[in-house]
């Protein structure tokens, strides 16, 4: 479970146009954090509709891992189209590979998301084989083929 503080912009004015929305959003967050609801079914289908609404050009995902830039961590660089649920999909794959995240640097340039993860597995850098498997699964997930 990743928990952080995010600021969001309500471009569609959902909260302003729906008087009960604030309570609904808080209830939904409580359901997910407590484990009573899963995030994936809630996000399913929304990413595509948001991208279509914005008329966004697709940014081809690029995933790169590096064991040379840091003495303690494998550095994972990801560039992809900014989309609803992107960080969730990335963190799910990282978790499925048994990796721990020590630091995440996130940036958005227009519709391009640039995320850098400092990761380990069992408190050591990933092996070459582990890096290949992780980057392959991330690439497939971001391309929608996995």
Regions found by a protein language model. Give the residues of each.
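Non-catalytic interaction/regulatory segments
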Residues: 1-146
């Amino acid at each position: 479970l990743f928990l952080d503080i995010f600021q969001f912009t309500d471009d569609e004015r959902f909260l302003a146009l729906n008087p009960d929305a604030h309570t609904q959003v808080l209830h939904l967050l409580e359901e997910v954090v407590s484990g009573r609801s899963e995030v994936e079914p809630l996000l399913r289908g929304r990413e595509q509709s948001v991208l279509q609404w914005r008329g966004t050009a697709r940014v081809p995902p690029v995933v790169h891992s590096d064991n040379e830039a840091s003495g303690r961590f494998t550095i994972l660089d990801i560039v992809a189209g900014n989309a609803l649920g992107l960080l969730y999909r990335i963190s799910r794959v990282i978790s499925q590979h048994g990796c721990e995240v020590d630091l995440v640097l996130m940036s958005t340039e227009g519709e391009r998301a640039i995320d850098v993860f400092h990761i380990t597995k069992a408190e050591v850098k990933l092996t070459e084989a582990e890096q290949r498997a992780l980057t392959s699964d991330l690439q497939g997930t971001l391309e929608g083929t996995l």
